[in-house]
C-alpha cells in the first residue's frame, strides 16, 4: 500500500495547531478543511492530463486539463464532513458519496448505519475522508462497501493516523493509497490516537 505522510511545512504547522487542548470549534473546523485541501493536492498529483485547444482572449490556446475518471469524495459520517469542503475547494465538480459509520465504544468495531453513493461508482475515483485513522475499522469497512459497489480506485485522506490503523488498512486493502498529515505514536487503551487530536468529531461539531 502506498502511504504518504505529507511533510509540507504548511501541513505540519496546521496539524500542530490542531493539537492544542483549548482550540475553539471554529478554529478546529477551519484547520480540518485547510489540511483536507492540502492532502487533496497531494493525493491528486498523479492525475493524468490531456492537452486541448480552447478559444482564449487572443485566439486559440492549448491548455492542460484532467482526463480519465471523475471524482467522488466520500466523507465518513460524521467527522469526515469536516474535511469535505477542503476537497471540494480543489475539485468543485466532485460528486459527494456519504457513508455512515460509528465506532462501538466497547468493542471498538465499526457499525454501519447509512449509505448514499454516487450512481456511477465504477467510473469514479473515490477520495475517502475521515480525520482519524485509529484502529482502521471504519475506513476498512467503508472501503469494503465501496469495492462492493464497483469502485476500483480508492484513496484515503486522514488528518492523523496511528501505526496500528495503517497496518490494519494495509493488510485489508493493499491496493489503496493513504495520505495523512501525521503518523502518530500509538493508540491508547480506549482506542484514541496519541498524541492525536482528541475527539475530532466533537471538536468539529462543537459537541465536546
From Swiss-Prot:
In what pathway does it function? Answer: Pyrimidine metabolism; UMP biosynthesis via salvage pathway; UMP from uracil: step 1/1
Which Gene3D superfamilies does this entry report, sorted A to Z? 3.40.50.2020
InterPro entries membership: PRibTrfase_dom, PRTase-like, Upp_B, UPRTase/APRTase, Ura_phspho_trans
The reaction(s) this protein catalyses: UMP + diphosphate = 5-phospho-alpha-D-ribose 1-diphosphate + uracil
Q: Name one GO biological process term.
A: uracil salvage
What's the short name of a Pfam family annotated to this entry? Answer: UPRTase
Homology family: Belongs to the UPRTase family.
According to its UniProt entry, what is the function of this protein? Catalyzes the conversion of uracil and 5-phospho-alpha-D-ribose 1-diphosphate (PRPP) to UMP and diphosphate.
Q: Please report the name of this protein according to its UniProt entry.
A: Uracil phosphoribosyltransferase
Species per Swiss-Prot/TrEMBL record: Shewanella sediminis (strain HAW-EB3)
Q: Which gene encodes it?
A: upp
